[in-house]
Every structure is written in structure tokens, then in C-alpha cells.
Amino acid sequence: MPCLIAENLTYSYSTQIPPALNKVSLKLEPGTLTALVGPNGAGKSTLLSLLQGSSRPDQGEITVGGKPLINNRAQVALMPQRGKLNWSFPITVEGLVSLGRVNHSKSTCCELEAALQRVGISHLAKRRLDSLSGGQQQRALLAKTLMNPANIFLLDEPCSALDPPAKEDFLIIIRQ
């Protein structure tokens, strides 16, 4: 399994001073669980966006398995913050989880069912996202992330909107 290395990342939103990130370096080893902790506005989501390849740093380099991230993005999956998504979009749970899959073969259907079962929402597969609770939406996002063939998973506030027992279940799923 490849590791992800970020070296001296700097990122600014237009002419923002100081930059959102300034010379940040880190190494994510295979099989580890790492948490980014800090106050709101500290740049955690910005860093995750860079590490996933959604944005490019102004300076610095990101590699996965020794190769530039741009050539190896399939190794990295991002579960975005729940609040950053438009939950009124008319789509079902299974539609969200399978979104972006090129073919919907029998194996894709089996993977979909396994992902929904793994996060405990297979009974909600046909329900629209806007009819779900915040915690159920969070589980749908995790199922979508788990459908990804990546080896590195970046989760942005994965336990928001979850009650304490659900947080514990969620962390068990993530550790697996």
C-alpha cells in the first residue's frame, strides 16, 4: 500500500494574507489512522482538498507511492463535509453511492449492497437523500467513499451530525 507525502504545501485563496496553509508537511503511512485537529478556519478542509487533488498547492509537492499525486489520484478518496453538499438534489441513497461508476454491472450492485450494509443503511437504499437525518446522510457519504477503489481515505468531519453511539459505530467502520 502506498504512503502519501506532502512537502512544504502553501495555499492561498486569491490574495489572502496570510495564506490558508503555509509550508505544511506530513506523511500518511499505510494502515494508520491520522486526525487533523484544529479550530474552524485553520485550513483542515483546504489541506484535505489538496491531498485529494481537488485543488493544487501554490507551492509544495504531494506524492503517493513515490509518484506525483496528479498521476496517482485514484489512490486517494475524499469524503467531504456533509454541510458542503446540496442535499435537496433529487437522488436516492443508492444513486449517490454509485454516482460516478462507469458501469453498473452485477459486481457493482454487489459492491453497492456491501457498502450500504457495512454502514448500516441498506434498508434506506431507495430513499431520497433529502428525506434522511443528518446521521443517515453521513453514513451514505461513508458508503460512497468505501465504494472507491482507493487505498488512502481522507474523511472531512466524518462524525458530524452523529449521536455518541453512532460515532462509536462509525469509528469502528473506519478502523476496519
Describe the residue ranges of each PLM region.
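Helix-to-loop junction immediately C-terminal to a conserved catalytic motif
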Residues: Q52
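Catalytic Walker B motif of ABC-type/P-loop ATPase nucleotide-binding domains
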Residues: F153-E157
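Conserved ABC transporter NBD signature motif
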Residues: G60-V76
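The feature captures the beta-strand-to-loop junction immediately N-terminal to the Walker
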Residues: V37-P39
